[in-house]
Structures are given as structure tokens and as C-alpha cells.
């Protein structure tokens, strides 16, 4: 909370959480700030009889945050829909709300044969309905974050998302995306700011969407110190989700082994391993 006024501020911040039946949980904190001061507020409470969110039962709550003056006058109010769900990795298996999760997913580009790369809400919803009818439960936003309306619809209708940062390094000396530490952007400090800005912008914008269960740091961009720092930041900022990074090749910068275009023999070899350490998701095949 940032006091943009040139005078001190006294008042309160109220948080209301409303479920689909209108049941409300309310919390409030008093605040006193000097001019220009910034403070961080956290609210903690137990929500009774939580209705968990999943792709099969997309239960949502509406959170409303209201800033009031000491006399009760409303200064500002904002709201968003969110949900409660738990994503885990146990014994190299991906779990949602304690149940093993099998990803049946696709990659998504903004494209329509009639409108080109302009996709509106109606077209988004048509795609979601088509996917749900065909037992598709997950989407990778290849290779960039989608409009916020897409995430709202996935929250509402129940699609799991791998949210991918708009980073790609084709044409930067990446013969088959191999590592070139002398000049590749993933290793060069002068490129760190550009990489991290895109990753942080994605996380901060989409962090309240329950449909987002995995962050992807980018597509086909090699792997180096730039991504090591980005991975560390994501894990510190958001401990409720996991990181998928295809170029990590199952190393320390990814929580999920997520190769592209593996052969059937390679997938069988992985499936028959006695002690796998990470879940396995084929993240791209036939450019889809």
C-alpha cells in the first residue's frame, strides 16, 4: 500500500472473501502512513468449509479489498476472483488437491482462420469448450502470456495452465538450443534484466489465478546463470507452484522433466526408470 498523498494517511484496509453462495469472510487492519510511505499488509484467516478449485470443479471466490479513511469514507476498492487449491510433487508425481494429476494438454497460440491473430472472448470460450469436450485438461501458453481474459475463463471453466514467459532465443547461436556460455543471452549478464523483467511481469500479473499451476520461464532459450537466478526468484516469490523449463533438461532449473519431440523409445525408457525424481510432461510435439 503506497500513500501517494503529500499528507499522512489514517484509515483501514478491509478484505472480504465471498464464495458462490454469498458466504462472506471479512478481515480488516488499521493503517497509518506518512506522506509517500509504502507498507506491506498481510491477512491470515481460516476459511470454513473451503470449496477447493480444480479443473473438474472450478470453485471460485471473489476477494474484495477496500481502502477507507478513518471516517469510513471509501478511498479505493478493487476485486478479483481466485480459488483455493494445492499443487504438489510427491514421489515424482504431480498432484492437485492430493490426487494424482494426468496432464492431457495442448499448446496454444492466438490464432483464428477468420480473424488472424486477433482473438476475442467469444473465440477464447469456443476453444475452451472444444477442449473440455475432448478431455483436454491443460494448456501451455506457448510462447507468451495470454490476455487476462483468457485466465479468467480458465479459472471459471476449469483448465490447468502452464503460464509461459515471452522469451525465446532462436537465432542467437543456439544450434539445437545448445549452450554457448561465451555469447548466449542465457549466460550474459547484460541480458539478465530483460529476461527477469518478462518473467517477473508474468508472475506478478497472473499469481492470483488458480488455473495457473506451473510457471514456464520461456521457450527454447538455452539454460544458464540468467535462468538460475530467475528460477530462484520464482521459488522465493511463489512457493505454491512449480517451474517447468524445457531447456533445463531435468536439471536444477526445472521441477518437471518436460522434453520436446521425444521418441516413443525415449518416453518408454523414462517411464521404466526405477527411481525417477521429477514428473514427466512432454511439453511439445508436432508444434502442438
Question: PLM ranges: what are they?
Answer:
Residues 1-161, 198-199, 213-214, 230-236, ...:
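Secreted/periplasmic carbohydrate-active enzymes, especially glycoside hydrolases
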Residues 128-131, 138-288:
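Substrate-binding/catalytic cleft of secreted carbohydrate-active enzymes
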